[in-house]
């Protein structure tokens, strides 16, 4: 389990937003996903009932789930993920397992980052203040020591550590990577001073004898990885403090020059160092031998610097030699390239001249070749080319007639073989085209029979899963509207591709028509591009504010559809789609049984075939009774036939009466198909008493 933080919750929410479409397509059936959300009070009873009704109305389950997830974004919390990835859901929807693992990876990554956050500790900052003042220290996570860095200070667990523990920490041996530099012995807050006054040293020695050293704030000393830098620091140390009777004395140094006045050390101790802001703190336990050696340092420092400069010069000379060698190699390669280009040009010129000489043939034999005149004094590159041409002409003239005749015969034979091969290839291509066309027709028929259109895919969604051979991806409709040259398909690796590139990835060399090869659940992309929603109402054939059906391209006004459509509902299926679904499984019943039952929603919508006629019955009254669900089947059929009968009697002598008769015949035909009953009398229509 992970400890939930604000950052982790935000990361899980962003990951939920990205994986929302994948979750929707992973859930392929309503039960038990909807029931789990309802039992855990994540969705309301009303949302649950609307979702089930949408699934019954042939709305794809994936689109219903996507609609639920978008509404749950406002109240996102950890309980939603717990319910979503429960053991029951993971068992019923296997595709959720990969999405669940991705959420676990996000939580694990943020849990690891929370472990690596710095820990705030407090430690005393001053010598005289002891543990009264504390400053927080951010200690990084433990890392393996590197040769270029000095060992880090140990972790301070309590602010009031004893003086013995601080002495033990200070007396630890340094790491083998930095044997020259000792650990700092005495550190003040923010500054280091060089002490040269005898009074100040005596005061410090007295304080050391009288009082114990308080716990000190350990710090790290930045040391370069080069071996020369510690030597330079040892050699460039300033003069040593005067000898004290106590033997060892902690020395505090600064890069600033030594003061001349006796009052300056106090002023220097109160001002920070000016040179690069670096603190150089060392504790040197001086002995008479070391002091004697250090007094003779000023002369040795110059020699050490001189040696360092020599080493640096040697290091600089090595890359210079390498650069010279690389320059020489590049010059040689350029010269070789120039030579090869000249040789190629001369060979091509010889071949061209030879072919021209062979083509002329008889002319060269009959007329003696006259040498070309070359003007003297032409100092240009063309002069050398003309000389080469003369040499080539002489060589070609010496060729025998036999060789020329043999070459001509070889060329004729090659031309004949090429023509024969081309004719054979053309015949083979024609045969292949005929066979492939017949095979394609046969394969098309098989493909259409074997892969029917899927009812679970919402083709009106902005993202559609597409396939082409072995390649799989998601098509984004908004990007597809800008043209087929736009990268609108994202494959499984996350790369964006155009339809042609996606087809090449799936089909390889056989990619010829992306509209036919790219498919979405049994439908080609070309068929999906042709499907567009109508701009007119299916009932009244007028425009305005229309509502689109979720399963077909029909549109309706809110009042034209029976029953009326709620404008707030986004997922619904029209009555025509429900009629189509029920007509396939409709059984044929007798008239008496059919007329006795109550009208159902799919029975209430019959096409409006005529203009309203206000006599004894009119269409508005029929529509009102259908909306209020007052009709039985017999009552509805009687009102409709009464309206046709009145129309027939009113328009006897006009051609408009024949239109009413045709509409009546069409109505009776649709009535049989929708209600599913057969007539007992074969002659004429069945009439009510």
Curated annotation (Swiss-Prot):
Keyword set includes Plastid: no
Domain (Bromo) ranges: 583-674
Zinc finger (PHD-type) stretch: 534-580
Motif Nuclear localization signal mapped to chain: 281-294, 428-444
Residue ranges, compositional bias (Basic and acidic residues): 314-325, 334-350
Signal listed as a keyword: no
Gene Ontology molecular-function annotations: DNA binding; DNA-binding transcription factor activity, RNA polymerase II-specific; zinc ion binding
Annotated PROSITE patterns: BROMODOMAIN_2, HSR, SAND, ZF_PHD_1, ZF_PHD_2
Key words of the record: Bromodomain, DNA-binding, Host-virus interaction, Metal-binding, Nucleus, Phosphoprotein, Transcription, Transcription regulation, Zinc, Zinc-finger
Signal peptide bounds: none
Biased composition (Polar residues): 159-168, 190-204
Classification via InterPro entries: Bromodomain, Bromodomain-like_sf, HSR_dom, SAND-like_dom_sf, SAND_dom, Sp110/Sp140/Sp140L-like, Zinc_finger_PHD-type_CS, Znf_FYVE_PHD
Induction: By IFNG/IFN-gamma and all-trans retinoic acid (ATRA).
Post-translational events: Phosphorylated (isoform 2).
Bias (Pro residues) ranges: 138-148
Regions of compositional bias (Basic residues) in chain numbering: 276-296
Region of interest (Disordered), ranges: 131-216, 231-385
Record-given protein name: Sp110 nuclear body protein
Phylogenetic lineage: Eukaryota, Metazoa, Chordata, Craniata, Vertebrata
């Amino acid at each position: 389990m992970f400890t939930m933080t604000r950052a982790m919750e935000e990361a899980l929410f962003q990951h939920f937003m990205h994986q929302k479409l994948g979750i929707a397509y992973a859930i392929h059936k309503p039960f038990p996903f909807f029931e789990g959300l309802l039992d855990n009070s994540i969705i309301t009873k009303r949302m649950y009932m609307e979702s089930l009704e949408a699934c019954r109305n042939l709305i794809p389950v994936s689109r219903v789930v996507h609609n639920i997830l978008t509404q749950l974004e406002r109240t996102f919390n950890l309980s939603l993920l717990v319910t979503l990835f429960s053991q029951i859901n993971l068992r019923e929807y296997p595709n959720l397992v990969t999405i669940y693992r991705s959420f676990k990876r996000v939580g694990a990554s943020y849990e690891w980052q929370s472990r690596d956050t710095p820990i705030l500790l407090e430690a005393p900052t001053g010598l005289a203040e002891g543990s009264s003042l504390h400053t927080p220290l951010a200690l990084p996570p433990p890392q393996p020591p590197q040769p270029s860095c000095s060992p880090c200070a140990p972790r301070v667990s309590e602010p009031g550590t004893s003086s013995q523990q601080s002495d033990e920490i200070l007396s630890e041996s340094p790491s083998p990577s930095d044997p020259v530099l000792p650990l700092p012995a005495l550190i003040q807050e923010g500054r280091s001073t060089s002490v040269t006054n005898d009074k100040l040293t005596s005061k410090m020695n007295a304080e050391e004898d009288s009082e114990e050293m308080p716990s000190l704030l350990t710090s790290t000393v930045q040391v370069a990885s080069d071996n020369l830098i510690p030597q330079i620091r040892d050699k460039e140390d300033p003069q040593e403090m005067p000898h004290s009777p106590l033997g060892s004395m902690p020395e505090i140094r600064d890069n600033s020059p030594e003061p001349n006045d006796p009052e300056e050390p106090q002023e220097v101790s109160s001002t920070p160092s000016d040179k690069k802001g670096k603190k150089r703190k060392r504790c040197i336990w001086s002995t008479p031998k070391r002091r004697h050696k250090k007094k003779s340092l000023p002369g040795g420092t110059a020699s050490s610097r001189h040696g360092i400069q020599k080493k640096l010069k040697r290091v600089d000379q090595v890359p210079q030699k390498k650069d010279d060698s690389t320059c020489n190699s590049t010059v040689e390669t350029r010269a070789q390239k120039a030579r090869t280009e000249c040789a190629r040009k001369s060979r091509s010129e010889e071949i061209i001249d030879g072919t021209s000489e062979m083509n002329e043939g008889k002319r060269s034999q009959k007329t003696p070749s006259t040498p070309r005149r070359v003007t003297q004094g032409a100092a240009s590159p063309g002069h050398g080319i003309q000389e080469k041409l003369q040499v080539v002409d002489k060589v070609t003239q010496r060729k025998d007639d036999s060789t020329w005749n043999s070459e001509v015969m070889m060329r004729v034979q090659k031309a004949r073989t090429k023509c024969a091969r081309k004719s054979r290839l053309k015949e083979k291509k024609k045969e292949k085209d005929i066979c492939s066309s017949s095979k394609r027709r046969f394969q098309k028929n098989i493909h259409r029979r074997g892969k029917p259109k899927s009812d679970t895919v919402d083709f009106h969604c902005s993202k559609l899963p597409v396939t082409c051979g072995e390649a799989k991806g998601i098509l984004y409709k908004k990007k597809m509207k800008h043209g087929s040259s736009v990268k609108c398909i994202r494959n499984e690796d996350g790369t964006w591709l155009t339809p042609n590139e996606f087809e090449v990835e799936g089909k390889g060399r056989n990619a010829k028509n992306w509209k036919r090869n790219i498919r979405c659940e049994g439908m080609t992309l070309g068929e999906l591009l042709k499907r567009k929603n109508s701009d007119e109402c299916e009932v009244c054939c007028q425009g305005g504010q229309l509502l689109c059906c979720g399963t077909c391209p029909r549109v309706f006004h809110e009042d034209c559809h029976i029953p009326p459509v709620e404008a707030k509902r986004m997922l619904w299926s029209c009555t025509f789609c429900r009629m189509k679904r029920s007509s396939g499984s409709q059984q044929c019943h007798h008239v008496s049984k059919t007329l006795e039952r109550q009208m159902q929603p799919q029975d209430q919508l019959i096409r409006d075939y005529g203009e309203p006629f206000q006599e004894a019955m009119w269409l508005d009254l029929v529509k009102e009774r259908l909306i209020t669900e007052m009709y039985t089947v017999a009552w509805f059929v009687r009102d409709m036939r009464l309206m046709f009968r009145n129309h027939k009697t009113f328009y006897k002598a006009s051609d408009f009466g024949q239109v009413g008769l045709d509409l009546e015949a069409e109505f009776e035909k649709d009535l049989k198909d929708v209600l599913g009953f057969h007539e007992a009398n074969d002659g004429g229509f069945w009439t009510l008493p």
